[in-house]
Amino acid sequence: MEPPGGSLGPGRGTRDKKKGRSPDELPSAGGDGGKSKKFTLKRLMADELERFTSMRIKKEKEKPNSAHRNSSASYGDDPTAQSLQDVSDEQVLVLFEQMLLDMNLNEEKQQPLREKDIIIKREMVSQYLYTSKAGMSQKESSKSAMMYIQELRSGLRDMPLLSCLESLRVSLNNNPVSWVQTFGAEGLASLLDILKRLHDEKEETAGSYDSRNKHEIIRCLKAFMNNKFGIKTMLETEEGILLLVRAMDPAVPNMMIDAAKLLSALCILPQPEDMNERVLEAMTERAEMDEVERFQPLLDGLKSGTTIALKVGCLQLINALITPAEELDFRVHIRSELMRLGLHQVLQDLREIENEDMRVQLNVFDEQGEEDSYDLKGRLDDIRMEMDDFNEVFQILLNTVKDSKAEPHFLSILQHLLLVRNDYEARPQYYKLIEECISQIVLHKNGADPDFKCRHLQIEIEGLIDQMIDKTKVEKSEAKAAELEKKLDSELTARHELQVEMKKMESDFEQKLQDLQGEKDALHSEKQQIATEKQDLEAEVSQLTGEVAKLTKELEDAKKEMASLSAAAITVPPSVPSRAPVPPAPPLPGDSGTIIPPPPAPGDSTTPPPPPPPPPPPPPLPGGVCISSPPSLPGGTAISPPPPLSGDATIPPPPPLPEGVGIPSPSSLPGGTAIPPPPPLPGSARIPPPPPPLPGSAGIPPPPPPLPGEAGMPPPPPPLPGGPGIPPPPPFPGGPGIPPPPPGMGMPPPPPFGFGVPAAPVLPFGLTPKKLYKPEVQLRRPNWSKLVAEDLSQDCFWTKVKEDRFENNELFAKLTLTFSAQTKTSKAKKDQEGGEEKKSVQKKKVKELKVLDSKTAQNLSIFLGSFRMPYQEIKNVILEVNEAVLTESMIQNLIKQMPEPEQLKMLSELKDEYDDLAESEQFGVVMGTVPRLRPRLNAILFKLQFSEQVENIKPEIVSVTAACEELRKSESFSNLLEITLLVGNYMNAGSRNAGAFGFNISFLCKLRDTKSTDQKMTLLHFLAELCENDYPDVLKFPDELAHVEKASRVSAENLQKNLDQMKKQISDVERDVQNFPAATDEKDKFVEKMTSFVKDAQEQYNKLRMMHSNMETLYKELGEYFLFDPKKLSVEEFFMDLHNFRNMFLQAVKENQKRRETEEKMRRAKLAKEKAEKERLEKQQKREQLIDMNAEGDETGVMDSLLEALQSGAAFRRKRGPRQANRKAGCAVTSLLASELTKDDAMAAVPAKVSKNSETFPTILEEAKELVGRAS
């Protein structure tokens, strides 16, 4: 049957018009077809194409054998080839493109053919035209597209319909795209009508033709959709996808396999978007029609008993439905719905199948599920970062479940949480276990909801329980650590006590050693002096002995002479000669030089000659140095002269001086000098004059002060006010001269030679002037209290600082960038107000009283009612000082509620009326018999409170002592002060506070007052970040200053008051014990127990006093070290400043970390957004590589390519970046993105790090601007 031409399509009409025309007319027809019409050409055979292109085409077995019969034609016999010689190259290229289109080749296979030479292209077109003509001449062996349409509309059934569909499938596979286009939407509609009719009809037998016909229609649809035209036409139909979904019947496995593959291919199409959602809608509609779950057919196809190919096809469709979705919630929802239907159990069975295609699909499913699970955990991290307010999170949860089926379950969860056992240690364990369970339920590792229909929910809690056990062990270890810390504190206290005792013992021993050493030195000097005196006396005795012997001999000679003279006088008559005076004896050794005149002879009337003048004083040494007279012997005794000789003999005077030599007066000598005294006699006590100074010596030491009674040189007159002082004496001959006096003695140094301007002052202690910085711009200036060189001392901290070692250009550039602006910020102040609570006391009526007033009796009755003991037993407990019964509160209440002594005395007189008295007065009668009750109670109270007072005072002393030692020893804190000094001097450049040698420690708390340019950072935050990045060792100083916090709570004034109060109380108790009357009751142990207590308390107090003294000494030394006045700055204020700074520094570190996390989060969000967009474009491009539905032309083999990509898994590979290396369950917020995220964008955004030497301010400024831009 010949179909009409002209109305069925351009290809068919052209072929009908060319019917009966000769081959000579083909070129013109070809030319016209290239312009306005299109040839309907038959496909070339593979062996003929190979002759030109060396390319083979798949599926040769499906090609008709008639082509082989026509392939033997030679090119020389082809009249078309001869006629093409006259066709232009442009027309040949047009025919060539039409040939490629009719050959049903895709773009990849067309490209090599286009690269051929024009001669080869002309031959290919010629041969193609010839074979097409030969095929058209065989109308009896083939049907046209319209014939198939008419047959499909004729109502064929069963076997005839099956034969027609099989023939149609072959034609759709073998004919060119133009034939498919001719079949077009009309033919497709006919196929879909038959398929719908078959779906609606119920099969009576399993092997009926309906199932085979439906399967053959699906195969025809697959062939029809193997090109872009067919896919577009199929997608334009309303029920095409639904009919494919209805064809997924596990009872017909082969048909379900083909239908699932077609639907999978449609799901991954790039255009139109959301094709997977259209397929899901069709599956939902089919489920509503059949009243089953929409994924139930897929689950039935995956269950055991089906073929592996069906299982692979169903799992492939599941992957195709989930993977293309962009929204995480959508993917998790689909996967969760499948899990609820039992996919989890089915997957376990599928994993046991050894099949490569199955393994590919399982890997795709698992990988996508794991990635979605990581995305969920990443979302949890974002929730933890952004939603940290309890009320806000609860309100959001309540709004999500309100008025829904989940609301009662949410309420039940909250109610169950109220049943958690209220135990301090157990409650956190409960919540940790609940959190882990919820985490595993919500964040399932396969990225889906759990199977709610299954009774068994597998939650891995063994590891969590092990962690809880380990945590319990850790808590026990922490408790032990706390206990050990207490022991450490006690050991530290004991160490300080021992140190104080040791220092006291050392000082006592040193004092004793000094005393003994002084006594030893005194005895040694006395011994040496006695030895010297002994030697002098022995020499003197030996000399006197010699003189006595000599005089004795002279006396003997004189006696002999007198005897001879007497004998001569007897013989010679006497005469009266003039008697010459006997010369005086020479002075004895050791005498003062005064010559004792001899006694006058009897009868001599002449006056004895005057004694010689005393020897002149020794001449003064040059420079006014004089030698004092020798001191007398110890005890003020002098060497007594020898006894006078026996008889009337006199010692002759010394011989006269040489002639012409006289003793001039001191004033007559030039220069006022006196004649040097004669050398002393042997044994003289005078001190020899000092030797002259050696050449080059520094001078002669000043003379000792003159002894009392001696005449010495008068002191020089004091210098006039403002005068230059006493000029130095001239130098000795040959000597270098006497150096000028040191500074401060009133003599300014001489000006430099040739100039009158004074030189720069020399800094003390080896200090060097501080470097003066000149920033490029003016910075915000820290307002510190500057310390100048005159404020420093030799051993203070600021004389040893070397802040220059922290200096670098990068630091100054950051300072300039951060603190260049000058903006004023206001600081809000918050006032705290506290409320007062009032207590009301109810009053009770009491019985009539005789001595006590009602209020006193009432208070005493209340006290006695709370303390249930007989009155006599209370008395005995007080007498015995029984500390096992007595408590501090009891004694305090007794002292407070006890009646006055006068009232007790009056009550004691009413002891005969004891039974008639009220209970409070009965108690007063009993207690009135205790002697000195109130002092006794005060002493007992002090005894009970003494241990507590010691335990309160001692830790405070130890804390301050340890804090002082830690500050002196902390190297990291010293480095922080040096860095702060460097930064402050740089920022204060050009101001009055520049060039500081140090600063007041209190300035540390003011670091946060200096704001950055953008008001987002303070100087404290800058220093914290600087230390964190460049000097991490400085961050250890909070740990090194462990006792600063405790020391900040210590009030030195209160500590002193407590010690003074303790001393007073000990003295009062000691006085009371001494003045206490003798005990009249055998149970009275007050004196006995208090005596030993006073002794122990005194020892404890002395120890505390020494520790307190040591603490004050250390704090005073700390003040000298850091240059502050300990009297003006109390211990509490100083350590409170340090404690506040320590906390502020730690807070600044945390805030810097949080700021970096926020910046990182913003950067991650930006990168994630860019990455998501990039992934979307890459995904779109990859899917377009499979098929571009918007491109021009009719590409063929599309369905084959899609199915091949689905089978290999290439269609499912989402390039979303590795997450395992970057995200883990419960990961910290500060974790960075994967290296893939930062490889492209972050490396381009963040400039490369340059060396510190080459880093300049503009580079830092650019980085900061870029950082601010990314943050905003």
UniProtKB/Swiss-Prot annotation:
UniProt's post-translational modification comment states: Phosphorylation at Thr-768 is stimulated by cAMP and regulates stability, complex formation and mitochondrial movement.
> Which compartments is it annotated to reside in?
Cell membrane; Cell projection, Ruffle membrane; Cytoplasm, Cytoskeleton; Cytoplasm, Cytoskeleton, Microtubule organizing center, Centrosome
Tissue expression profile of the protein = Expressed in brain, heart, placenta, lung, kidney, pancreas, liver, skeletal muscle and cochlea. Expressed in platelets.
Linked pathology is: Deafness, autosomal dominant 1, with or without thrombocytopenia: A form of non-syndromic sensorineural hearing loss. Sensorineural deafness results from damage to the neural receptors of the inner ear, the nerve pathways to the brain, or the area of the brain that receives sound information. Patients may have mild thrombocytopenia and enlarged platelets, although most of DFNA1 affected individuals do not have significant bleeding tendencies.
- Entry-linked Pfam families: Drf_DAD, Drf_FH1, Drf_FH3, Drf_GBD, FH2
Q: What is the effect of changing T768A?
A: Substantial loss of phosphorylation, no increase of phosphorylation in response to cAMP, increased stability, reduced interaction with OSBPL2 and OSBPL10 and reduced mitochondrial movement
The family this protein is said to belong to: Belongs to the formin homology family. Diaphanous subfamily.
Listed Gly residues bias regions: 1-12
Instruction: Specify the FH1 domain's residue ranges.
Output: 583-764
* A GO molecular function held by the record: signaling receptor binding
Functional description taken from the UniProt entry: Actin nucleation and elongation factor required for the assembly of F-actin structures, such as actin cables and stress fibers. Binds to the barbed end of the actin filament and slows down actin polymerization and depolymerization. Required for cytokinesis, and transcriptional activation of the serum response factor. DFR proteins couple Rho and Src tyrosine kinase during signaling and the regulation of actin dynamics. Functions as a scaffold protein for MAPRE1 and APC to stabilize microtubules and promote cell migration. Has neurite outgrowth promoting activity.
Do you know which PANTHER family this protein is assigned to?
PROTEIN DIAPHANOUS, PROTEIN DIAPHANOUS HOMOLOG 1
Task: According to the UniProt record, list the residues that bear Phosphotyrosine.
Answer: Y1121
Which part of the chain is the DAD domain?
A: 1194-1222
Family annotation (PROSITE patterns): DAD, FH2, GBD_FH3
What is recorded about the domains? The DAD domain regulates activation via by an autoinhibitory interaction with the GBD/FH3 domain. This autoinhibition is released upon competitive binding of an activated GTPase. The release of DAD allows the FH2 domain to then nucleate and elongate nonbranched actin filaments.
Q: What is this protein called?
A: Protein diaphanous homolog 1
Compositional bias annotation for Low complexity = 659-674
Q: Where is the composition biased (Basic and acidic residues)?
A: 44-65
Q: Where is the GBD/FH3 domain?
A: 84-449
- Self-association state and partner proteins as the record states: Homodimer. Interacts with the GTP-bound form of RHOA. Interacts with RHOC, PFY1, MAPRE1 and BAIAP2. Interacts with APC; acts as a scaffold protein for MAPRE1 and APC to stabilize microtubules and promote cell migration. Interacts with SCAI. Interacts with DCAF7, via FH2 domain. Interacts with NCDN. Interacts with OSBPL10, OSBPL2, VIM, TUBB and DYN1.
What is one term from the GO cellular component aspect held by the record?
A: ruffle membrane
